[in-house]
């Protein structure tokens, strides 16, 4: 649910804190995605399109969330976006009342839905269908399995996914939180993205926490008080208090206890809610936990086709697209790396997007330090040894169906066009520096081959005339284009 009425209030009071984005504009960014919220959106989208039915496999298990997850992850990778899916665990005790209330609301909605279906009232069905959906444990587990087979990072929250997402942003492991729940902001997430899991026709909304604080003229502690008074999942609300009244009360009293006592509420409940927002229980992760892994084509085929009855032809096309997007990304990244020197002596572009403030700039209590924090160190046991960043991972972890080490090695000429282009640009940059070199030295350029040893993450330069391995590449005598590429690749993998 999040904070009641927060977005409409901010749209009116601090419109500059909310902006619209396209999915393409997030290229190169990493998103901490609230998995439960995303799976809910995927399921709703399928059920909305058919009024009340879901996609199911031969066992009668819902697969709507799998279908939605496949499509959205495909888009993320196509645009060079790194998704990190964060899954809820056991909810905190403070949320018990809220969860019970939601259960009762679902039961009532189910009864109304059955009646609307029997009467053929399609409009009522469409309104009610979303209220009956619940993301089950089985749906979460199947989603995790799919993501891992795709090489997409999976993070397990200690309790609330929103708090864990905010932690990842606070620790600079991800740039944005993608969720429909606005309490992510109250947990300290610097940037909240909404509608990320919705259809591509919907604009993504970005909420900037620092701009919210500046516009409301609140410090972070006052913002928490304001949001709790608006209504959250962890305590009851005060009668007659919405966002506008809450804003006025915080401005006047600037103290949550005084406000609650003035309105005749139980401050202990509000105090516990505030303490949880300031010090939620989260698992500790490092950068290895959010790195993209390898795609498992065989595992994906078995899971999607055999276990969940997806079309084999469509699954093959899906896997082909995933591999294509990863290859495209590495080519772009490698080319940028090799041609970077030509920009060294130029002024920086005035259009470059400035780095936005971190959550730490506005949150007084940070995860992992200070009194009352609840950080539990989590080993990244789900991450394989060869799972590394997108750019490096495609260099050293290309999927292979063979156990033979020889088959795991790839030659540069597989990307011949890329290296020719890079070589020409590099030689143009260096031509003045090396124009005095002899023709004999230049001829060596045609007799060198670069090989990758994927298992050991090494780059090898070979003299084709006598198959001898060249152990060094002299950076001061680099008239050979392939020697230059070798030199940069050595720098890349160190």
Swiss-Prot record:
Known EC number: 3.1.-.-
Domain of life according to the entry: Eukaryota
Chain segments carrying region N-domain: 1-106
PTM text: Phosphorylated. Phosphorylation upon DNA damage induces relocalization to the nuclear plasma.
Principal location: nucleus
Record field: compositional bias (Basic and acidic residues): 408-426
Any one Gene Ontology BP term: base-excision repair
Molecular-function GO terms, alphabetical: 5'-3' exonuclease activity; 5'-flap endonuclease activity; DNA binding; magnesium ion binding
Assembly and interaction partners: Interacts with PCNA. Three molecules of FEN1 bind to one PCNA trimer with each molecule binding to one PCNA monomer. PCNA stimulates the nuclease activity without altering cleavage specificity.
Protein name as annotated: Flap endonuclease 1
Classification lineage: Eukaryota, Sar, Alveolata, Apicomplexa, Aconoidasida
